[in-house]
Design a protein with these regions (language model features):
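Positively charged, helix-rich recognition surfaces that bind polyanionic ligands
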Residues: 8-14, 22-234
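Beta-strand/loop nucleic-acid-binding surfaces
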Residues: 2-6
């Protein structure tokens, strides 16, 4: 036996919709089920602010950071090789179809890696904190910067927020999306605006506060959330 798998059984009245989906590695039946997923867990008494980035996946208001896995970047050579093999095959041939399928499988693997990573991290963060704050980023607007678009898509920001909000509901925790304006520029100690370029990685203020740029932003994000909802315990 390689491992175990938990099975959930639902009555036919709970199944609201069934869809047949084709992926690069086969067909899947997707069932939409109406079920209460909420679970009660003990309050942790902790609150945290998260600043997502490209260098680190996120830095929190405690100064801890999670490395960026860069699944797409790490698979770029393999993807280029797969694309090249597709272009070398004659259109309409069986070999070209096989090459296209292999390319699709590679993209599918990256997509699943991203989703699982975002889900794992979000679940861990939510279960460890009673309130989680993050920036209300508009990803579509940010990726208009073509120099950063590939890195931003590879950074899982959208998936991570989606799972934070899902697990927030499931475990009865508070999730707050705050206005991202000035979170990196404002001093988390005195509130002074300290302008800096993207290449400036250290926040240095005249008040004497010197912090990693992302750490400073994460503290500001948490402060903004707490000013909105108060010091909340669930």
């Amino acid at each position: 036996m390689i491992g175990t798998w938990d099975l959930a059984f639902y009555g036919t009245e709970q199944i609201k919709r069934v869809r047949l989906i084709r992926r690069a590695d086969g067909y899947y039946a997707q069932l939409c089920v109406k079920v209460d997923v909420r679970e009660e867990i003990e309050p942790s008494g902790n609150t945290v602010g998260l600043d997502v980035g490209l260098k680190e996946f996120y830095t929190d208001s405690n100064g801890q950071s999670e490395p960026n896995p860069r699944f797409y970047r790490n698979a770029e050579k393999k993807l280029k090789r797969a694309h090249r093999r597709v272009s070398q095959k004659r259109k309409g041939s069986a070999n070209r179809k096989k090459a296209v399928n292999r390319l699709g499988r590679t993209h599918l693997k990256i997509s699943r890696q991203r989703e699982e990573q975002a889900k794992r991290l979000a679940r861990c963060v939510i279960k460890s904190n009673d309130l989680v704050a993050y920036e209300d980023l508009r990803i579509k607007n940010i990726v208009r910067n073509h120099c950063l678009a590939k890195s931003i898509h590879d950074a899982l920001w959208y998936q991570f927020r989606k799972w934070l909000e899902y697990f927030g509901v499931k475990f009865g925790k508070i999730t707050v999306a705050v206005n991202p304006a000035y979170t990196s520029q404002k001093c988390s100690s005195c509130g002074t605006i300290v302008k800096k370029s993207l290449s400036t990685r250290t926040h240095i203020c005249q008040c004497g506060c010197e912090l990693d740029r992302d750490y400073n932003a994460a503290i500001n994000i948490l402060k903004a959330a707490l000013s909105t909802v108060g010091h909340t315990e669930t």
